[in-house]
UniProtKB/Swiss-Prot annotation:
One of its GO terms (biological process) is translation. The lineage of its organism: Bacteria, Pseudomonadati, Pseudomonadota, Betaproteobacteria, Burkholderiales. This is Large ribosomal subunit protein uL10. InterPro entries: Ribosomal_uL10 (IPR001790), Ribosomal_uL10-like_sf (IPR043141), Ribosomal_uL10_bac (IPR022973), Ribosomal_uL10_bac_type (IPR047865). Keywords: Ribonucleoprotein, Ribosomal protein, RNA-binding, rRNA-binding.
Length: 165
């Protein structure tokens, strides 16, 4: 059923609001994907707080006008699904991971930090660890010297007790 003018304006406003908060936008061609697979992709996107939507390209172009994602408008051709996220890598990671298991989802382009990326750029962005993973690695690196020192003190205390006994 075609959208009337008010519905189109509402869609553009909704997508523009998402784009205004976003750090990353990823475009992927979804030709030939089964409905069940698309539902799975949407569920994974929801878990990662990624706004994922199939849009008419003209409406998407209007939504990105005047934003840092405006250069992506040139890439908006064909049947596309749009992944939009506030997290810098979440949209790229969700779409890239799904495209590995389903060859019918083809990453077309993306934009991060005002720069348009091709498929390789989106895949490179997706390979970056998440903020939580980076924080846990940093914490481990910071704890390693302290825990090593604590183990050395414990070993020294055991040695002293063994000598005293």
């Amino acid at each position: 059923m075609p959208l009337n003018r008010e519905d189109k304006q509402a869609v553009v406003a909704e997508v523009a609001a998402q784009v205004a908060k976003a750090q990353t936008v990823v475009l992927a061609e979804y030709r030939g994907i089964a409905v069940g697979d698309l539902t799975t992709l949407r569920a994974k996107a929801r878990e990662q707080k990624v706004y994922l939507r199939v849009l008419k390209n003209t409406l998407a172009r209007r939504a990105v006008e005047g934003t840092p994602f405006a250069p992506l408008a040139e890439q908006m051709t064909g049947p596309l699904i749009y992944g939009i996220s506030e997290d810098a890598i979440a949209a790229a990671k969700v779409v890239n991971d799904f495209s590995k298991s389903n060859d019918k989802l083809v990453i077309k382009a993306g934009s991060f930090d005002g720069k348009v990326m091709d498929k390789a750029g989106v895949q490179a962005l997706a390979s970056i660890p998440s903020r939580e993973e980076l924080l846990s690695k940093l914490l481990f690196v910071m704890q390693a010297p302290v825990s090593g020192f604590a183990r050395a003190l414990a070993a020294l205390a055991e040695k002293k007790q063994a000598e005293a006994a």
